[in-house]
């Protein structure tokens, strides 16, 4: 079992709002962009499933409990009502790995992957404005989709990596 803490630090000055979506007001009286974290890859209990209206406002903290009952690659992303895509685009998305001591295949036989070095990558496309800041055109006819012109790997545009001549396990 893991407890993962999310602290919302997206205020109205740093958070981008499109259309008529309004900021949420936290119990501390501060306003900001709401977040709700949803995790794919685990049978989470309802309070930790990140449903769209269970939001954390600016300055607030929420602890999520995940059972980690099996090995695998999971991922999390924002799930706040009407702004999921924007929050994920600006960074509230990532990978979550659960590893066992031995990687066992479907028939109970070892996969023999335990000594292979792993590399983890998140792939996405983004658009940058003239100041090299992430950008979404709120008036674009594809406002609910994004067709980025720059490929990012784990947050880095067009990266490169030096590798040794050996086996690697890539998790994407």
Regions found by a protein language model. Give the residues of each.
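Histidine-centered copper-binding motifs that mark active-site loops
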Residues: 1-171
